[in-house]
Regions:
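N-terminal catalytic cores of peptidoglycan-degrading enzymes
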Residues: 14, 54-55, 232-351, 541, ...
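Catalytic glycan-binding domains that act on GlcNAc-containing polysaccharides
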Residues: 55-222
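Structural recognition of the beta-strand scaffold that forms the well-ordered cores
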Residues: 75-78, 101-103, 300-306, 325-330, ...
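Basic/polar, cationic surfaces and motifs that engage anionic cell-wall
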Residues: 212-274, 372-479
Length: 660
């Protein structure tokens, strides 16, 4: 019988084992946080020591542009926040060819800058590599708003995309033109600009237009404030009394869609674009599996991906019965959502069948590393609302043990580890994303709590990466959610090794190499402190990251940890939590329980994310009546092993409170 320290039993039982039977209990805390109206102000509340006397020129630029074109200043600020969070992005285009704080689009310029995105992926061919040809930059409704803004302002398109102040003037001019085109007065009241705001989104469907306008007015009510990526301080004071005039949007004559067949919240614009489910020659089928979740088995995870393709091509790929699949795609330009696979069914998206069987996959239009491929606020907000809704509906806790990046999903066996995908990568802003879901990452313990939660100041934290444009070349400085991990305190010390990523385990600064990285929201067991450096247990090593007191990159946390049982020199870890052989019924092949190439040595501690009994969903035929769910008695703990999660058998470890 496995020995568990007496002191750990009540805590472990209440927080983990009981959660197997009562998943909704884990939801209560995040859900309460969603109702806090100041969630949009998270960046404003960041440590002020890191602001370095921010300048107010951008605030003045909004004020001047609003006055010049007769647009309410708050409307201009709110629209810009939805487009870019007021950032300039170093004059680089978004994935939808938008530039600057107002996201003025110039597709031809963006295509000249970015070119085709067909460079060889460092970890092997991308999933779309079998479809040759250059990718086109996506943009709204085929028009470039920078050219329109140039005609309205007399400012060159080149300056409009490069100069943030000019860019804001261009956005104000476009809003004013939309207001006039709708036959509406140049009113000082924000509500009277609902139609112009909706038209600014470029949406061609009524649902998308209403959603964008609704998000802008939601922001007007809550307010926001932050320091931009180039050090400018911007503030939008809250106006809780403001409500949009949606009848202005209704009179725009846009196409009505509807989310009648989708699993989406009512206030999101979703459409049903089904992925095919059909038999293929030779006895195969594609491109997903039918199931009956959660009635038959629970949904435990939501996996966040980026597409590495434009929205249009992504839709063509998911329509291919010989290809892979995912549940949702979110468009960058306006946050529009397409659902392809019903949540009760199993999509083929994570590269790990165990995770697929228990997960919902969401693709976001974007490119992990290409210069300027930043994600719009509209996309972040749509995704956050969708994930919040799905988490509540299916009892999924809002934490990084359950909301995974594709780059957090483990390989199933040693041979699959190196080829696992690495999206959404270090430029996905996990802190902002979780704040939008009402579950910001906070300190949950004191100095002796025993765990740390990674939490970078995204805009200010700009570690070195290479390989965004050319192999080995430094990437442009950019905000990042990840910290770098070294073998000893000091920026010049070697990076920790990841024996699964490449031969010899050597880690690099490559933007696609997460072998020596930890990312915002992930929790690790504390392994030491020395000056401005903090150590964690990571892939069987003590790993150090820079965590200075005046600009912290992590906060203290409490929870549960596992450590090898006494007498064990090390314990194996697994990429899937499969049942014991005795659990399989006749006719279902026994799946081997194969350890990964990693292990947890004696004396090391790893943060626990969840507990689960072994499970395998057998689905190898088009006929769903032959599908079988196998449940075992073996108990596993999911741990934060490295950048990816992994599983350990409960019989191999002791589970303890994390406090030290």
């Amino acid at each position: 019988m496995r020995r568990t320290p007496v002191a750990a039993v009540p805590l472990a039982a209440s927080l983990l084992l009981a959660g197997l039977a009562a998943p909704q209990a884990a939801w209560s805390a995040p859900q309460a946080a969603w109702n806090t109206p100041r969630t949009a102000w998270t960046s404003w509340n960041a440590p002020r020591a890191s602001w370095n006397a921010p300048r107010a020129e951008r605030q003045e630029a909004f004020r001047a542009a609003a006055a010049r074109y007769g647009v309410p200043e708050k409307v201009l600020l709110a629209v810009s926040y939805l487009e870019s969070r007021w950032d300039a992005h170093q004059g680089l285009p978004s994935v939808t060819a938008g530039y600057g704080p107002m996201h003025l689009t110039d597709p031809r310029r963006a295509l000249r800058l970015t070119g085709p995105h067909d460079a060889l992926h460092p970890t092997g061919p991308r999933r779309t590599s079998h479809r040759a040809g250059p990718r086109r930059v996506s943009h709204r409704a085929g028009r470039g708003t920078a050219e329109e803004a140039a005609r309205l302002t007399g400012i060159s398109a080149d300056r409009l995309v490069r100069d943030p102040g000019a860019n804001i003037l261009g956005g104000a001019a476009l809003l004013a033109r939309h207001q006039r085109d709708l036959g509406l007065p140049m009113s000082p009241r924000p509500a009277d600009w609902s139609g112009a705001v909706a038209r600014y989104s470029g949406a061609t469907g009524a649902g998308d237009a209403r959603h964008f306008a609704g998000e802008v007015f939601s922001l007007l009510r809550t307010g926001a404030g932050r320091i931009t990526d180039d050090g400018r301080q911007v503030w939008l004071s809250p106006s809780p009394e403001i409500a949009p005039h949606m009848e202005h949007v209704d009179r725009m004559g846009l196409r009505e869609g509807g989310n009648r067949n989708t699993d989406c919240p009512a206030n999101l614009a979703c459409e049903w674009l089904p992925a095919p489910y059909r038999e293929l020659p030779g006895g195969g089928y594609g491109n997903h599996d039918l199931s009956d979740r959660p009635r038959e088995h629970r949904i435990e995870y939501i996996v966040i991906h980026d597409t590495e393709e434009t929205y249009g091509k992504t839709l063509r790929l998911v329509d291919d019965p010989t290809y892979v699949s995912w549940h949702y795609t979110i468009r960058s330009s306006d946050g529009h959502i397409a659902q392809h696979v019903r949540t009760r069914d199993i999509a083929w998206h994570s590269g790990n069948w165990y995770v697929n069987a228990k997960a919902i996959g969401i693709e976001h239009e974007g490119f992990l590393a290409k210069a300027g491929a930043w994600y719009t606020e509209a996309m972040y907000r749509s995704s956050a609302r969708l994930v919040r809704y799905l988490a509540r509906r299916y009892g999924i806790p809002l934490d990084r043990a359950h909301i995974l990046g594709h780059d957090n999903v483990p390989g199933t066996v040693p041979g699959s580890v190196a080829g696992m995908h690495v999206d959404p990568g270090p430029y996905w802003d996990w802190g902002h994303y979780f704040a939008l879901m009402g579950s910001p990452f906070k300190a949950t313990g004191g100095a002796h709590a025993g765990l740390v939660t990674i939490r970078t100041d995204y805009a200010r934290h700009r570690p070195r990466y290479t390989g965004c444009e050319e192999p080995g070349e430094d990437c442009r400085p950019h905000g990042s959610a990840s910290v770098r991990l070294h073998t000893a305190p000091g920026h010049g010390k070697p990076l920790v090794r990841d024996v699964g990523r490449r031969s010899g385990g050597r880690s690099t600064y490559g933007v696609h190499d997460h072998g020596a990285r930890a990312t915002t929201g992930q929790q690790y067991a504390l392994a030491g402190r020395k000056g401005d450096w903090t150590a964690i247990w990571y892939l069987g090593q003590r790993a150090w990251f820079h965590n200075p007191h005046d600009a912290p990159t992590a906060v203290n946390a409490g929870g549960l940890i596992v450590t090898p049982r006494p007498g064990r020199a090390s314990v194996p870890v697994y990429g899937r939590a499969y049942p014991e052989p005795e659990a399989y019924p006749k006719g279902v092949p026994v799946q081997p329980i194969v350890p990964l190439q990693y292990m947890i040595p004696r004396g090391q501690r790893y943060a626990v994310g969840l507990a689960t009994h072994g499970e395998y969903y057998h689905s190898t035929t088009y006929d769903e009546t032959a599908h079988r769910l196998v449940r075992g008695r073996t108990l596993y703990y999911q741990v934060q092993l490295g950048h990816r999660v992994a599983f350990v058998k409960a019989d191999d470890v002791d589970i303890l409170p994390s406090s030290v």
